Design a protein with these regions (language model features):
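Non-DNA-binding regulatory cores of transcription-related proteins
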Residues: 89-151
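Short, Lys/Arg- and Gly-enriched loop/turn segments at beta-strand edges
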Residues: 110-114, 155-163
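Short, compositionally biased
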Residues: 119, 161-167
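Active-site phosphate-binding and catalytic loops of NTP-dependent enzymes
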Residues: 80-91
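Residues that recognize and position ribonucleotide moieties
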Residues: 29, 94, 157
Length: 167
């Protein structure tokens, strides 16, 4: 787009806003109750940040407001599409969205606990994996004692399901 006939002050850059966690088109945005609360809290924080900008330069303030407005727009879209899945109504004997799963890893026998959550909630450091992740997709509808094999590069990793908790 040509920018030849604009005022000098109007030549600010459009803010680049990082996209939210990937959610394929047409896939419902399932979230846990905690996940929705987390999204709403993030919205409150962004609104507060936008209202309390410490920038005195008008041009910088407008750029920062545009950036925060763009982030809010993406967040509002995600909240509007959110579908809360009540974990307490899930069958306790099989893995479903929101379940916490204890796995034993193949030959090493290492134990690992993971919870299957929404894309915006996923954080492997906290043991939370997205329901669209390859491992979560393999675990859904499995039961205690079942095994799943995750194919990685040159190695297959076998996970045995040791426990399932829905709370």
């Amino acid at each position: 787009m040509s920018r030849g006939f604009v005022r000098e002050g109007d030549q600010e850059e459009v803010p680049l806003v990082p996209q939210r966690a990937y959610l394929p088109a047409g896939v419902p945005n399932f979230v846990t109750r905690e996940g929705l609360e987390q999204l709403l809290k993030e919205k409150e924080e962004l609104i507060s940040e936008r209202e309390n900008l410490g920038v005195t330069n008008e041009n910088e303030k407008r750029i920062e407001q545009n950036y925060l407005n763009a982030k809010l727009h993406l967040l509002n879209d995600r909240i509007a599409e959110a579908r809360v899945v009540e974990i307490t109504v899930q069958p306790p004997e099989e893995i479903t969205f929101g379940a916490t799963v204890t796995l034993k890893t193949g030959l090493s026998g290492n134990m690992q606990t993971l919870r299957i959550v929404g894309v915006d909630e996923a954080d492997i450091a906290q043991g939370k994996i997205s329901f669209i992740s390859p491992l979560a997709k393999m675990l859904i509808n499995k039961k205690v004692g079942d095994k799943v094999t995750l194919k990685r590069d040159r190695q297959d990793i076998v996970f045995e399901i040791i426990g399932i908790e829905c709370k």
